[in-house]
């Protein structure tokens, strides 16, 4: 397992900052030599992407260098929602390099996003990031990425995450510090229990012993059985995610009253995202907070959700990454809405990126890396159920095994 390395030592002969600037040092060199910059990336993660140069797509030039390679996430259990089941999730891992420093990102694409490895690699192949010779032009770079073609939010998020990781390394700081967030304020993360048979549900609950809140997938005829099965095994607080599975508002309200008696603390996306009036009625009468997920994809959706939901679930793969997620968080708080920072099934790369925002969120659902069996990274940790940020630059990522190859 490898760790980030920092360069804290300066030679006695190193010129002063003013002398450096006077000698025409670039801003990047100035930042690097004044000790704000981490050394050039992760040795272990570098080996993880070593095969990219030969096998992957690549755009290069004097500016940013983008590399990407397909990956498939293997789920520990079949993942069943209200309307679908799957055992794998398609993914694309990317790297973004500048002057020997590398940032990492990923695009995780569950079916409902409408993206695929083919669409993501096609999108990434169209990007000309070599035109940018200064990674600190983050707004310009990400506006360009978003403008290339519509949709492709997960693919765009992969570039956004890698750029944030890169810039954080150039600054020598994790993003939660750059944003001024207190790592002590991170919430507990929920652990997801997908729809399954009572026997498998009990097994999943047993695996989730370290977690202080469980997220239960509902939206089928077995909803009450799911909750009763879980309650027979644990008394920890629950939240439920219906994934648009309830269509009758009165039935939904009756169910929420019953769920409150069972120790549920909030309800996520109980009705279809198109049922706006019904959802607003349900929120008005609900004894529990309601959270919009599928209804809230990007920044313009936050204002639309006000009055329809009590809060929103922000996911990097929906909103094109950390930049817009931070904007959504800020806007939601200004509207007095609650915020959950969520995820898809993802590696520790995207989870660590999302975790940088968690200190300002009421809830976290950052277990996507815990639901897969082939996570190539190590990043944010969960300690006694609590999201625990790492004081490492960028998003705080390292490779689990320096010999690991794609």
Predicted regions and their residues:
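Flexible C-terminal active-site loop/helix
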Residues: 32, 36-37, 41, 60-75, ...
